[in-house]
Amino acid sequence: MPARWDAFSALSVPPPILEEESPSQFWGEDCANVAQRCSSLPSSDCESLTSSNSYSECDLDAWDEISIPDSELLNDPEGEQLCPSLLKLINRCLTKARINSLRCSRLLIPDELLCNLGQELLHLAYSEPCGLRGALIDLCVENGKDCHSVAQITVDQAVVPTFQLTVLLRLDSRLWPRIQGLFSTKPVPGSGQSLKLSPGFKVLKKKLYSSEELIIEEC
């Protein structure tokens, strides 16, 4: 009888449980290699605007398809559908912008700028509660240390903005002799002409529902 009990006990012992390795061992190395692109600024150099251009109130025409490369980060279908119309509005605001109260110079926007800006807007909006619809966008043009406000866009008036994006655009550096008289206070003969924007730009992101530091992305 004891022999049978010992045999039964030996059969009933469960196999040992093997502990799995911590998942952090698999992605820890990847996280360590990710470069931090965030920094903080005490305040923005851009002046506040007295008026705003709303996406929902503008009469937008059919916008030609803009090719935006696929990315794992662009996982917001609603934002991807909204982005082409938003870029159309941004293009319209920039071409109609009054750079100076004395004269109006038309800004030329390269296609590469709009394409890159579309990618960046989706990238910065993908983790937000309302996605791109919750964005408040300030368009500015940099001139040396000065920052000139162009327009402010509320993407969706029906949504309370959850984050603010300040887009800092730059004029083409090859046009510097023509740029010098653009922002002057005195009229310069022949200066009211078209100027081309550079494909490069900088975006400052500020979350409106938290006290986190500003995030700066430069393209």
From Swiss-Prot:
Transmembrane segments: none annotated. Its main location: cytoplasm. InterPro entries: RTP801-like, RTP801-like_C_sf. GO terms for cellular component: cytoplasm; mitochondrion. The keyword Cytoplasm applies. Belongs to the DDIT4 family. Regulates cell growth, proliferation and survival via inhibition of the activity of the mammalian target of rapamycin complex 1 (mTORC1). Inhibition of mTORC1 is mediated by a pathway that involves ddit4/redd1, akt1, the tsc1-tsc2 complex and the GTPase rheb. Plays an important role in responses to cellular energy levels and cellular stress, including responses to hypoxia and DNA damage, via its effect on mTORC1 activity. Plays a role in neuronal differentiation, neuron migration during embryonic brain development and in neuronal cell death. This is DNA damage-inducible transcript 4 protein.
